[in-house]
Amino acid sequence: MTDLSDFVANAQKEIKNAQNTEALDLIRVSYFGKKGHFSTHMASLSQLSVEDRPAAGRVINQAKKQIQQWLDTRKKTLQSELLARRLSSEIIDVSLPGRRLQHGGLHPVTLTIQRIECFFKKWGFSVESGPEIEDSEHNFDALNIPSHHPARTEQDTFWFDSERLLRTQTSGVQIRTMKKKGPPLRVIAPGRVYRHDYDQTHTPMFHQMEGLILDSDISFANLKNTLQCFLQYFFQKELPTRFRPSYFPFTEPSAEVDVMTQNGEWLEVLGCGMVHPNILTHLNIDPEHYSGFAFGMGIERLAMIAYGVTDLRAFFENDVRFLKQFK
């Protein structure tokens, strides 16, 4: 029982003759598995006397250790031989040209936002941001939008409950900024806004840039000059513009601004007006001392005009063929 020399020699021969790791693994299982040779030897110890068991156990353990070492060594050898065969069969032609890297680029909406921000920062405006999940106070009430206004309905606004909603405009950022900083101030607020609408020229989510100046002695002439200079900067040429009377609850008087396209048609690009006194009063700002103007523009609309895009949905479809044109 204590002489395992033939057993060990046979194991060494089997391990040496193994031609791959799969065959070697079968040998390992035959010796060390639950029903393997060593399990049989260990079970036979119970047949020996108490005095002989320790010596026999040491012999078995030494055999296990030796066979395990041979298995490990043979496995490393087989793996090295396999790697050498693979390397010799996989010839790399270093003369082949390398693959060209695909460089990414900024999205046209991002480019448009940066372009607008560049102008207004030079004019002393700061860039502010606010929550996209807004409350009715900042999205409607503080903006002089009455409770019966159609913009509050579920047909136009995504409501979570009676108070929380996805903001329909970034004007709420202006309200928060006026509360936090007070006049005088110059601020623009770019960001995502949400409305119930989806067609060739509308999407449920789009980007908007709103701006506000609040100071003493601000007039409509200041508003007109600011926006005309901006449009000339943005389109890189002096386009004919017109200011049409309009209505917005948060400005009085209000106007919409059109530019003339190359085919001689007028195209609306933004809305604007003088800040309504009710808004200033609501924020405890004296409308007799302070006045201001506000404006808002759709980023995608300006991008469509600037880049000649005809379908608004192209900005959100992530078609690489479309996006790579703006690198």
Swiss-Prot record:
Binds 2 magnesium ions per tetramer. Transmembrane segments: none annotated. GO terms for cellular component: cytoplasm. Mg(2+) binds at E252. InterPro entries: aa-tRNA-synth_II (IPR006195), aa-tRNA-synth_II/BPL/LPL (IPR045864), Phe-tRNA-synth_IIc_asu (IPR004529), Phe-tRNA_ligase_II_N (IPR004188), Phe_tRNA_ligase_alpha1_bac (IPR022911), Phenylalanyl-tRNA_Synthase (IPR002319), tRNA-bd_arm (IPR010978). The gene is pheS. It is an enzyme of class 6 (ligase). This is Phenylalanine--tRNA ligase alpha subunit. It is found in: Cytoplasm. One of its GO terms (biological process) is phenylalanyl-tRNA aminoacylation. It comes from Hamiltonella defensa subsp. Acyrthosiphon pisum (strain 5AT). It holds the Pfam family Phe_tRNA-synt_N. GO terms for molecular function: ATP binding; magnesium ion binding; phenylalanine-tRNA ligase activity; tRNA binding. Its EC number is 6.1.1.20. It comes from the Bacteria. It catalyses: tRNA(Phe) + L-phenylalanine + ATP = L-phenylalanyl-tRNA(Phe) + AMP + diphosphate + H(+). Belongs to the class-II aminoacyl-tRNA synthetase family. Phe-tRNA synthetase alpha subunit type 1 subfamily. Tetramer of two alpha and two beta subunits. Its cofactor is Mg(2+). Keywords: Aminoacyl-tRNA synthetase, ATP-binding, Cytoplasm, Ligase, Magnesium, Metal-binding, Nucleotide-binding, Protein biosynthesis.
